[in-house]
Amino acid sequence: QGLLPPGEEGTDSPAVVDDIDGEPFINDDGSGYIFWRRRNAGRLSADRLHLDGEPVTLATARQGYSEGPVMFKRKGIYYYIYTLSGHQNYVNAYMMSRESPLTGFVKPEGNDIFLFSSPENQVWGPGHGNMFYDEGTDEYIFLYLEYGDGGTTRQVYANRMEFNDDGTIKTLIPDMRGVGYLAASQETRPNLALQSHFYASSEKSPRTSVVNIETQPNQPLPEKGSVKSYTRTHTYQATHVADESNGTRWMAADTDSSPFITVDLKEIRKVGECQL
């Protein structure tokens, strides 16, 4: 269902809220809502062009600056996802309501922080994300960004979200396996790129990061006993574009004003399909 009524998609109007991370939500009855940073939310007018009434601030179990909200509904339960902290300690927590998109939210039973860093899988600071779902199959995919090397990394990750019988969200362990089209390839044809030479205008220098990560954000140990130090090095070689890994990438040098990359197949080859 579109956010605006049919025929009004191109309407030029002021921003509904003068802020960032606006998250629209359309309820089952067609009523519209919008959520934005700092736990703010409001009901939308019928034309979706302004707020209907005063905004509210949603109360959450955890305090601290928050942005990147997500709202969705599953089996009669409204889920409000909000972020906390940042960089390598970025996490996603949630609240549940059986009343409405703006009222009745309570802390779920068990762990309310469902997504956080996985040093074992080399994913640091899974932050601002959003939901794709198919109500017909009850399949929910959570997409998010990784902020472990600062706010400009923004590598996109995706994992399936699963639920317990009571509707609570199971802890989601971030990884680089991907889902759907980006999951482990079942392709049996040879990847010609793996046998090719790659030439790039430049390559960004390797970057080594040393960070302290809270490994138990739901129940931290006293005196930072669950905070551990981790080190990793990112490289940005041209060959990364074809290594069939979701966790690597090529990046040109910061001083490269006209970046390009060339793949040399070394001989005339028949290419069956290109995937970008």
Residue ranges and their predicted role:
Residues 180-268:
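Disordered, acidic Ser/Thr/Pro-rich linker "stalks" and the adjacent N-terminal cap
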Residues 269-276:
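A short beta-strand element within beta-rich, extracytoplasmic domains
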Residues 20-23, 67-70, 127-130:
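Beta-propeller and closely related beta-sheet repeat lectin domains
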Residues 1-63, 73-78, 83-120, 135-137, ...:
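Beta-rich carbohydrate-recognition and catalytic domains
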Residues 125-127, 154:
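Short, surface-exposed coil-to-beta transition loops
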